[in-house]
Regions:
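Nuclease catalytic cores that cleave nucleic-acid phosphodiester bonds
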Residues: 78-203
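Domain-level signal for Mg2+-assisted phosphodiester chemistry and nucleotide/NA-binding surfaces
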Residues: 1-101, 149-150
Length: 203
């Protein structure tokens, strides 16, 4: 069997789904989605999800926290965290200042795991759910140093990358069917009995 690890760029997938107007598909069962991306003769070795905890917006914090707890309760994946970095910006005209947050390190962690797993021979094929062109260099390294390994790019909805199309062995786009069939149950019970419910904004 061909060993496959699926690497999911959380924010690239999230914003692609939102830009497509498909928020009802955000309650994703990621291991189930990863399984649906396999072809006959392939075996899912691991599902790795890369994200960062959002800041500033209470609604987004609540929804993300519920979702991450639901994923952890279901199991079947590992979650790798980057961080949100605070930046102060200033208007050049009126000199007003405000705080913005930008996500850092998620793509670096994904690239690092992708390379580490290749050099440790943990997969035969890597399937990357992302259209982030910054992933081109690690894919180039894998193709150079591990010519028998394959890297496949699965572009989230409303996302594309000329650079990844040029360097990945194969690429395809995630469509509505796979997303709609890979939803978590409406409510998930944690080990302590607490029920995590799908956010109303995602229904």
């Amino acid at each position: 069997m061909e060993r496959v690890i699926v690497y999911i760029d959380g924010f690239n997938l999230y914003f692609g789904i939102c830009d497509k107007g498909w928020r009802r598909y955000l309650w994703l069962d990621l291991p189930a989605l990863a399984t649906r991306l396999l072809t006959p003769g392939q075996q899912l070795v691991a599902t790795k999800y890369f994200t960062a905890r959002v800041r500033a917006d209470p609604g987004k914090i609540r929804r993300q926290s519920t979702y991450l707890q639901a994923l952890e309760a279901r199991g079947g994946l590992t979650i790798h965290y980057g961080r949100y970095q605070e930046r102060t910006k200033q208007c050049h005209s009126c000199h007003a200042a405000w705080t913005e947050y930008e996500e850092k390190m998620s793509d670096v962690r994904l690239a690092s795991e992708l390379l580490r797993d290749a050099y440790s021979d943990r997969y035969d094929s890597a399937l990357i759910v992302s259209a982030d062109a910054d992933l081109q260099p690690p894919i180039e390294m894998i193709r150079l140093d591990h010519p028998l390994k394959r890297v496949v790019a699965a572009f989230p909805p409303a996302r594309d990358s000329y650079h990844l199309r040029g360097i990945a062995h194969e690429y395809f786009r995630l469509g509505r069917a796979r997303l709609s069939k890979s939803q978590l149950p409406p409510a998930i019970k944690k080990a302590d009995g607490f029920l995590l419910r799908r956010p109303v904004e995602w229904q």
